[in-house]
Amino acid sequence: MSEAVETQPPAADTVSAVKGMKKNGKQWHDNKTAFRPRANQTSWDKRTAERKALAATKAKEKELKEEKETERQRRIDAIKTKRAAKEERERFQKMEEKMHKRRVERLKRREKRNKMLKS
């Protein structure tokens, strides 16, 4: 009798895992799997920790973007002020030239008058 018991293989090894039905009953479709929502697989503490980490990274990214934008705005303002100063200088230079020309013209007219009076 002991020999008969030894020859039989254990029942647990031969039984394979039960698979779900084919989708739509067709061979080429995948097997159905058990519906297991992802929400219950991770713990609440782990999810809150992930949210905090994500919020921290987003805050850091926002801060870096703001710094970058302020630097860009500062450069733009510097360029604008330089351009405005250059335009102002050019305007004054043109005005000085005009004023000088007018003064020279006035002096020439005076000289002509004086010549006419003397002659």
Swiss-Prot record:
Q: Where is this region: Disordered?
A: 21-47, 82-119
Task: Specify the superkingdom.
Answer: Eukaryota
Q: What is this protein called?
A: rRNA-processing protein CGR1
Q: Cellular component per GO?
A: nucleolus
The similarity annotation says: Belongs to the CGR1 family.
Enumerate the Gene Ontology biological process terms: rRNA processing
**Alphabetized UniProt keyword annotations:** Coiled coil, Nucleus, Ribosome biogenesis, rRNA processing
